[in-house]
Every structure is written in C-alpha cells, then in structure tokens.
C-alpha cells in the first residue's frame, strides 16, 4: 500500500494551551471542518471526541494526548491533543518531542496564563515552530491586542498578527487577512460556520489593517534568509502574495516569529483560516532539523536521522495507552523508512526484539487498521512487550537510539490500599499498567510498613490515577494522606577514610577507601570520580566502591530520604591480596560515605512550588497573608484583566488543601495554579519536626 500523502504534504502538529482556553473545542472544530466529525462534540456537555477517557469528559479537562489524523487542502494533518493542566506537563513534554509544529491556543479574555509559560518553555526547548490562535473572541472582555502584548512581555515571544479581528465580543464578525488584504466574514447561519464570504476591508479598519500589514512585512524581512524581501521592502516595491507567504513560513520555521490568528471555536468562526495557516506556515517533516541519535553499540558515535522514506526504519515510542479492547497501544512517530504490520523490529533502548502485531491510525477513539506506516507519520502499534515511553524502535540492520526524553521526578506520594484483600493482586496489575503509560508516575512498596506508595506530579495527577484504577480496572482503593517527597544533601566538604576488615577463621574480608565528599551542583544528582593512581585499589574493585556510594544515596543520614547533588572522589585506599573482594569494598564505601555525610552538615530539602494566584483586589491582602503563613515567598505582583496576580514560591508541604482554603477565603472568586519548580533547604525548626516524625 503506497503512501496516501507525499512526505512534504504531512503536518504533525500539537494543539497546546492552558485550561479553558478552548483547546479541545478547537480540535473538535478542526475535525468537523476536515470532514472527520459528523456532529460537533461540545466540552460543555462532556461529548468531545478527543477527550476519550471518562474522567476527562467529567472534569472537562484533557488529560492524555490522543492522536488523530485528518486532511485539509490536500495535506495530511496529524494532531496530538495535549493536556492543559499543570499536573500533566509530562504529557505536553512527550508530545512536543514528536511534533513538527504547534498551535498555541490563548483565550482572548484570560490571555497568557502560568500554564502557557510552561508549555512555551517546552516549545522553545524542543524548537517547535508555532502559530497562535486567539480563541473566544466573542466573549465579554475579549482583547486580541492585549494577548499580543502579553505574549511579547510575559513569554518573551515575537508575535506577528497575520490576521486582525473585525469587531470583538458580541460584535465579532470575522477577520482581516493581512496577506491577501481581504475581510473574511462568517454568515450567521445554521451550517455551523461552514459558510463565510470574502469582501473588501471595512473603511473604519483599513488604516489599522495597513499598519499591521506593514509590521508583518517588516518582521519577516528582518529574518536571515529573507534578505531579498528586505531589499524590495526598503525600496518601496510591492511584495507579491507568494513572497509574503514564503517569508512568513521561513520566519516561523526559524523560530523568529509566531504568526497570530483569531476566532471563536465555540461559535465556529476562524477555524478554517487557522487550518489554512497550519498548512501554509508550519513545517513538513522534511523542513525540520533532522533528529539526532547515537548508535546502540557505541554511544559516543552521534548519527543524524533525516526524515525520509528510504533508509532503515527508525521511530520513537512517545506514549503508551491501555485500551479496553486491544490491550496496550504504543504510539510511535516514524522518522525514517516504513513499518509493516506483522514484521519484527528492534527496541534499541532495551536491546530487545519486538513483533509488530497490528498498526492502527487513531481518530480520537475510533481506530482504523493499516498495513504500513511511513516516515513522518504517527500511529499506534499493538502487541509490543518491552517498549515504554521514550524508547527507540528501529530495524535490526541499523540499530540507532534516538534522543531520549527527560522526565521529572515525582514530588508527592500517597499510600494506597485495596478495600478488600481480593483486590490486592488486581491493584498491583492495575498500578503496573498505569506506571507503564506514565513515566512521571512511580509505584513502590515501603519496606518498613509494607504499604504500596504511589508518587506523581500533583494531587490531581494522583486523584485521576486512583480514579482510573476504579473505572478501568475495577479496583476500589483507600488513599492515605499525601506525603511530600523530601530529599537530603550536605553543605560541607569532608575527607573520610574507612577500613572494613573482618577476620573470622578461613577467608576474611578487607576493603579500605579514602573519599572526598562534597556538595554537588544543583540538579547533578550523584557524581563519582575515580582518582586512584598506581593501583593502590585494583581496577576491578572501583565499580564496587561507586555502587556502594550510589546505593547509600537512596537512604539519607538524617531521616532516610534519598540524597542528591553529592560529588564523591575516591582518591586513595589499600587492599589485601587474599581477603579483598568486591563486597568488602562496597561495604567500606557505603559505611565511609554514611559516616562522611554525618560530618558534612547534612540538610533536608523540600520541593518548592511556583504558585500563581489570580484574585480580585479586595481579597489581595488576605491571600498574601495566607501565603506568608504557608512559608511562601511572594516574588511578583501584577494585573490581569481587572484582577491582581500574585506570584510566589511556596513549599509543597504547606499547599495541601489550598484550593478549599482559597475558595472559602475569596468566596470562590480566586483561582490558582502551581507547578514544581526546585528543591530548597528547609528551615531548622521544620527540619527537626520532619526528622522526629520520620524516626518516630
């Protein structure tokens, strides 16, 4: 079966936004206009196609990025819907990894929200070109130009309107296309916004349209590679429509500008013009920088994997989902070559052979079986045994490992227990499946209490996973109080000698090490240096020393929390010809490391959350007072659409139950968002409390 669309006619895009910007509605409309959807699904009544899990429909927020395929103007558009809630940034992160372009949806009233900043940062990290869609232009308080200003000041982006709105709020009629210099006005009819007509620009907006067209042309002519446009522009020559379109595309793909469009998905205006922009300005796989990787057998050998149909198969698994009917679905993005159903591939990340059962293309929840999937396409594979998120699947003939994704460590834990003994085994299986789908969700058993502990990125994240356990796996669970994931570190540098010697008839044990233990840079975790000269400790025992230190890192000296950011150098020691062995050196290192840490002024670290509260001015004092009581540090205060914005760093330990407290303190008029930011040392009095509680 040949390709349905040429590689250069494929667009892989994500639709990203904060909660309530109207992202799911926008995706629904796109599916409707591209002919995939017969009846428009509304989030308001919980029937949107992309929100395919029951809880998403109930909560009206999108949790998992469902992938779907549609067609517009002869181009194939693969859409990945990404969640807007901050507890699910991991989902956004993994979808950004496999996209070539993105549509950032902003609410014309709410503008740039804290979640938008997180998504924008991820977009920049992965170099994903974007188009902005300013949605909800029909709402009271809508202001297209305020959103443009916020993108510039708060996100440090370079927004360039390629359309401007005709009217706003109740009078929003359509947009002016600044490339063609025509007005596009939607009919007020029953055909769900399918009918619009092109007319001349209204006289009262002509001057504004000319001014914004000037700005647009100026922005694109400043970009490297568009010098010919700059020359024509400076000499006062008219640029042709094709030249402007090519200029906008080059500037967008080069991450120099972000074209802005406007509309209201709910009222079916502006979605077709957004699709036109996606097809015209976002890159095909062939127009993106090729993905880098390393060879499986030699991690130092960097290779470049271009997007092409020829060459050996290479793809990245970016999402795992459990489907009630077909079992495990592994979503992959193919970068090179093609893949046939029934064939064998190599998982180079795990060095395992996998058999491809079926290949399906998803349309939100409906699926279509296909025989083959090609470069640049996104699809789901059934029947993989070993593959998890972030693994590379490739051909046996060219074992390449594509760039790995980085996943954040969980910051919050709760104990879960099945309501009945009979559910114990079912719960174990359910949690294992959920953990396979979501790398930011961890499950372990507490050795002391025997309880099952689940950890994730926030209260909502864990709530939803417990809820899914109940719905999808029919396991009822009791959930304990949330626990904070503390860490431990040291503040001083120490040199520590430790000799482990055991003589007991027959063979003894002997290991002797000198370690320098010092605080590492933030975020480095555990770093080990071997500076043994002249074989005072034989080479084969060095890994045992490293292992002894690394394993001890998981159990700190103050309260048994994992340690981080510690730098260890092994610089001297001695051994015994007969009695030395790996175990002895491992124990010497472990005990020496522990003893050294006790002398190095150990400290407890806690996760600090970046919190943003939007609050009416009357309640501002109460909110700030409350944040201070929670050991918060207020970092900034500002205004947004008539409300006050308070930014602060607050310890996670103080944020449990905050939503209820904030609601009652402000009569439900304030909203907040929070995300993990960094670890910081806890004050002495808090540290003493934590140690007392942990050590009973």
From Swiss-Prot:
The keyword Lipoprotein does not apply. Gene3D superfamilies: 3.30.230.10, 3.30.70.240, Elongation Factor G (Translational Gtpase), domain 3 (3.30.70.870), P-loop containing nucleotide triphosphate hydrolases (3.40.50.300), Translation factors (2.40.30.10). Residues 8-286 form the tr-type G domain. GO terms for biological process: ribosome disassembly. GTP binds at residues 17-24, 81-85, 135-138. GO terms for molecular function: GTP binding; GTPase activity; translation elongation factor activity. InterPro entries: EF-G-like_DII (IPR053905), EFG_II (IPR041095), EFG_III (IPR009022), EFG_III/V (IPR035647), EFG_IV (IPR047872), EFG_V (IPR035649), EFG_V-like (IPR000640), G_TR_CS (IPR031157). Keywords: Cytoplasm, Elongation factor, GTP-binding, Nucleotide-binding, Protein biosynthesis. Catalyzes the GTP-dependent ribosomal translocation step during translation elongation. During this step, the ribosome changes from the pre-translocational (PRE) to the post-translocational (POST) state as the newly formed A-site-bound peptidyl-tRNA and P-site-bound deacylated tRNA move to the P and E sites, respectively. Catalyzes the coordinated movement of the two tRNA molecules, the mRNA and conformational changes in the ribosome. HAMAP family: EF_G_EF_2_B (MF_00054_B). Belongs to the TRAFAC class translation factor GTPase superfamily. Classic translation factor GTPase family. EF-G/EF-2 subfamily. This is Elongation factor G.
């Amino acid at each position: 079966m040949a390709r349905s669309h040429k590689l250069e006619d494929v667009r892989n895009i994500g639709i990203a936004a904060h909660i309530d910007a109207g992202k799911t509605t926008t995706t629904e409309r796109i599916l409707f206009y591209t002919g995939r959807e017969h009846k428009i699904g509304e989030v308001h009544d919980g029937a949107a196609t992309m929100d395919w899990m029951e809880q998403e429909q109930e909560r009206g927020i999108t949790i998992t990025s469902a992938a779907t395929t549609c067609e517009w103007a002869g181009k194939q558009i693969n859409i990945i819907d990404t969640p807007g809630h901050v507890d699910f940034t991991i989902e956004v992160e993994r979808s950004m990894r496999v996209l070539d372009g993105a549509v950032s949806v902003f609410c014309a009233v709410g503008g740039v929200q804290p979640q938008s900043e997180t998504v924008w940062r991820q977009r920049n990290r992965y170099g994903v070109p974007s188009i902005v869609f300013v949605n909800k232009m029909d709402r009271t308080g809508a202001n297209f130009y305020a959103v443009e200003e916020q993108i510039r000041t708060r996100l440090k982006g370079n927004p360039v309107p390629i359309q401007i709105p005709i009217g706003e709020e109740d009078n929003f009629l359509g947009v002016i296309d600044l490339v063609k210099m025509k007005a596009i006005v939607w009919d007020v009819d029953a055909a769900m916004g399918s009918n619009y007509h092109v007319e001349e620009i209204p006289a009262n907006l002509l001057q504004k349209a000319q001014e914004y067209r000037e700005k647009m042309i100026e922005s694109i002519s400043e970009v490297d590679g568009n010098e010919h446009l700059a020359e024509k522009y400076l000499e006062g020559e008219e640029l042709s429509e094709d030249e402007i379109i090519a200029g906008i595309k080059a500037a967008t793909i080069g991450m120099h500008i972000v074209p802005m469009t406007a509309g209201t998905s709910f009222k079916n205006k502006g979605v077709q013009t957004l699709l036109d922009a996606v097809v015209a300005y976002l890159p095909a796989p062939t127009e993106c920088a090729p993905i880098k990787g390393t060879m499986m057998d030699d991690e130092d050998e960097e290779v470049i994997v271009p997007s092409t149909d020829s060459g050996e198969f290479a793809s990245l698994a970016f999402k795992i989902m459990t489907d009630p009917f077909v079992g495990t679905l592994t979503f992959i993005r193919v970068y090179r070559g093609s893949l046939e159903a029934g064939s064998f591939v190599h998982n180079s990340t795990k060095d395992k052979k996998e058999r491809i059962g079926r290949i399906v293309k998803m349309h939100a929840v409906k699926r279509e079986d296909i025989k083959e999937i090609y470069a640049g396409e996104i699809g789901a594979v059934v029947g993989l045994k070993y593959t998890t998120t972030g693994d590379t699947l490739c051909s046996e003939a060219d074992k390449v490992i594509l760039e790995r994704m980085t996943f954040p460590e969980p910051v919050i834990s709760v104990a879960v227990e099945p309501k009945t003994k009979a559910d114990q085994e079912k719960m174990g299986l359910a949690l294992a499946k959920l953990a396979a789908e979501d790398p930011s969700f961890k499950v372990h058993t507490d050795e002391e209490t025997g309880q099952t502990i689940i950890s994730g990125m926030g209260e909502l994240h864990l709530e939803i996973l417990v809820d899914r356990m109940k719905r999808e796996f029919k396991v009822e669970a009791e959930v304990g109080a949330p626990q904070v994931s503390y860490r431990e570190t040291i503040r001083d540098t120490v040199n520590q000698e430790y000799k482990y010697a055991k003589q007991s008839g027959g063979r003894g044990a002997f290991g002797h090490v000198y370690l320098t233990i010092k605080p590492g840079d933030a975020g480095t975790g555990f770093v080990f240096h071997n500076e043994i000269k002249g074989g005072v400790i034989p080479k084969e025992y060095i890994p045992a020393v490293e292992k002894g230190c690394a394993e001890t890192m998981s159990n700190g000296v103050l309260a048994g929390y994992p340690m981080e950011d510690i730098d260890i150098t092994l610089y001297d020691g001695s051994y015994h010809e007969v009695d030395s062995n790996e175990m002895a050196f491992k124990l010497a290192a472990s005990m020496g490391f522990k003893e050294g840490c006790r002398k190095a002024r150990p400290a407890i670290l806690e996760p600090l959350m970046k919190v943003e509260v939007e609050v009416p001015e009357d309640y501002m004092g109460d909110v700030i007072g409350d944040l201070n009581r929670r050991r918060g540090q207020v970092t900034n205060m500002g205004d947004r659409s008539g409300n006050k914005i308070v930014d602060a760093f607050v310890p996670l330990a103080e944020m449990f139950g905050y939503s209820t407290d904030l609601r009652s303190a402000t009569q439900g008029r304030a909203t907040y968002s929070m995300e993990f930011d960094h670890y910081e040392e806890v004050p002495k009095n808090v540290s003493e409390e934590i140690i007392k509680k942990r050590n009973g």
